[in-house]
Amino acid sequence: MYNFTDTNEILKSYEMGIQTTFNGKTLERELTNANGAFQTVMISGRGVVDQEHQTVDVTGRDGKVFRRKSYKEREIEITALISGINNSAFRLQFEKLNELLDTNEPSDLIFGDEPDRIYKAQFESADIPDEESNQQIIKLKMICYDPKKLTNKKTVTGNNVNYAGSKETFPKISFIVGVNVNEINLLHVEQQKYIRLKGTYIQGNRIEIDMKERTIKLNGRNELKNFDMVNSRFFSLQKGANTLRLTPSSQLTVEYSEVYQ
């Protein structure tokens, strides 16, 4: 029979501590109730990301020749206290935790002390000690195969985007065609890259360009058949000023997340 744990203090204090939200569900809120509690205690892995270096050996040359770098996946470890008021409640806590961690693809991982950053994480494993009482300190290992972190979606209306992220981001850009036309050009002035469409477009048509997925839609339908693949280039937003020029002119809506390392 497990010892009884008074969860009153945890119930009072979890709102003030570091909360863990995964796939839209806050673990403290889902697992803290009259039958037990969950409290994030410590998080590691949110700092510097390790790099991998590609090098080449050259005969007769000291050392190696550096070619390029890439970032390794980010490993985040969540240390937490989980408890139940009795044996049965304790087992139910773990059933619920398993359910909350079960996703088929990397999902949003957000921490209460860093609410404006989103990690794309997949649960990998748990370090759980032998059950000697109805409360335990456990460790949850989350893998971010893409080590970068994001902000919530931002929307800018107009031709100028002042991008604050430290890494490039690929926006979604949409607009309503203002006049009947047979060619549309969307230019990123600083990069001198553009999207060119050659087709029949009438006033009121809606064009949506997804730079990440490399899709173009006209009124919700695939429009890549009229995409100038030879000369066009999908582009990103870079840190600082990003000036967009649409011909013929129309109001642009730019949606993006800021990306940080």
Predicted ranges, named:
Residues 50-65:
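SsDNA-processing nucleotidyl-transfer enzymes
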Residues 61-88, 134-147, 242:
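Oligomerization/assembly interface segments of phage tail-like spikes and tubes
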Residues 70-74, 101-103, 132-136, 165-167, ...:
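Solvent-exposed loop and beta-edge segments used for protein-protein assembly and interaction
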Residues 79-81, 110, 141-143, 174-176, ...:
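Residue-level recognition of well-ordered beta-strand positions that form the cores
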Residues 106-148:
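Short beta-strand and beta-hairpin "edge-sheet" elements
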Residues 148-261:
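Intrinsically disordered, low-complexity segments enriched in serine, threonine, and glycine
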